[in-house]
């Protein structure tokens, strides 16, 4: 080994020891007769002292920041009053006898700890990863992964690898396709999840499986998504919903406790999907901001205000929420901004009033009676604001108000966004309407067990034995009890519009396995990137991934995706069409 110790290891008890340290030159200070180097590695930082009479003193002339050096010297206590309590090695320094330059650094485009634009950070990721922030995040990710592995090992789970090169089963996002050179015209697909393989492992008798696994989705990237991501994949046999939730809560609570000393309240709260949509306008609620959505229909039963009267006559709804202490912010201009936002979200507009020395509103002339009833029924206080909207589509109304609620919360009540709001959303609808495909599709995936009492030809009434884990408004995990009977699986395919021939073509190998003894089973998958980012206090998962892609799916470090050699394309019998 070139070094005897790391840069975060030496203490006052090591005084007098001869040591060798290796690391990066963080800073250089020249005080005339003595020069100081702050030497850094991933373990910490040590102050190096170069006296004017030492061989090391002149070598400092050649050094640049971020050069890599080997230092030989002797540990001594720092003079009294010069200790640095901000670093672990702050009681000592190393008096250098020799410095060897291992690698001289050119001027860097930026230095560790600086925060240039994200594009620059991603292009020179090897520099960015030297920063304390990124080092802390990457080490936290490793520790969380280890905690997860230890937890499942203690419970008798086996970590079993599943294939990366598999077949395309296009249900949901697009697959990344990999052409086969040996089988021209045929393609592998990179897995969006190990879903079918982990179910086959249950059929194979491996009743407790987990895997920390890379997954791939070729989708139009929304904010803070990655084309490749890591999930903690879990599957168990002979279980029902309660068993999966209990094991999951044990894992998540241990991760928070052992990685960061955070105690979560167990069991986690549970909210039915319908309640989440009615109260928060989303199936990923963040309850820290309060401001639950309310049905204000009671105040408008006899209203003559034309816009709302027309909506109610068509069977529509009037809903809204109270924003506490928001009156000073709620000017006419702010009201116009919020109204414009609601129109962007698909509604006709927004009605509002505030309690500011009485009821104030641009709509007061037409709706004073209704406003007074809301203020009284909802126990509004001086300074509160009430936002109201109406629409014939209750789902659209909930979603629009839910979006507005969250935006107001993040912009004006960020001080409430502390701690961790952890909950399960349960009792999901099995199907949802896809505007793009103009048909009903499985909300989770088509291997989810339906609640059999709800299974029929009315898509809107079928419920799924599915569950999502939500932390601070982010979906961190999702899973379900799986179908283990072939007749039920075939019924789901039928409801999805998959003919027997199509089902055999896409999932024949899987359906074949159903003939040979399938245990009841279920599982869940957690997004490791998101879980780590929440614990780390980072708003973007890119901050907890060593080498992430941009929002456009580009690796700025390597330039991927890139063109390939024409010869490679010919071997694969692929021709690129322009346009």
Curated annotation (Swiss-Prot):
Q: Name one GO cellular component term.
A: cytoplasm
Which reaction(s) are listed as its catalytic activity? tRNA(Asx) + L-aspartate + ATP = L-aspartyl-tRNA(Asx) + AMP + diphosphate
Q: What are the record keywords, sorted?
A: Aminoacyl-tRNA synthetase, ATP-binding, Cytoplasm, Ligase, Nucleotide-binding, Protein biosynthesis
Residues engaged in binding ATP: 217-219, 226, 475, 527-530
Q: Where is this site: Important for tRNA non-discrimination?
A: 81
Chain sites annotated for binding L-aspartate: 171, 217, 444, 482
UniProt keyword Zinc, yes or no: no
> Which portions of the sequence form the region Aspartate?
195-198
User: Which EC numbers characterise this protein's activity in its record?
Assistant: 6.1.1.23
Indicate whether Cytoplasm appears among the record's keywords.
Answer: yes
Q: For this chain's UniProt record, which GO biological process terms are given?
A: aspartyl-tRNA aminoacylation
GO molecular function ontology, one term from the record: ATP binding
Write one Pfam family the protein is assigned to.
Answer: tRNA_anti-codon
Q: Which compartments is it annotated to reside in?
A: Cytoplasm
Of which family is this protein a member? Belongs to the class-II aminoacyl-tRNA synthetase family. Type 1 subfamily.
Assembly and oligomerization: Homodimer.
Q: What does the UniProt function comment say about this protein?
A: Aspartyl-tRNA synthetase with relaxed tRNA specificity since it is able to aspartylate not only its cognate tRNA(Asp) but also tRNA(Asn). Reaction proceeds in two steps: L-aspartate is first activated by ATP to form Asp-AMP and then transferred to the acceptor end of tRNA(Asp/Asn).
Q: Tell me what this protein is called.
A: Aspartate--tRNA(Asp/Asn) ligase
- Which source organism does the UniProt entry give? Thermotoga maritima (strain ATCC 43589 / DSM 3109 / JCM 10099 / NBRC 100826 / MSB8)
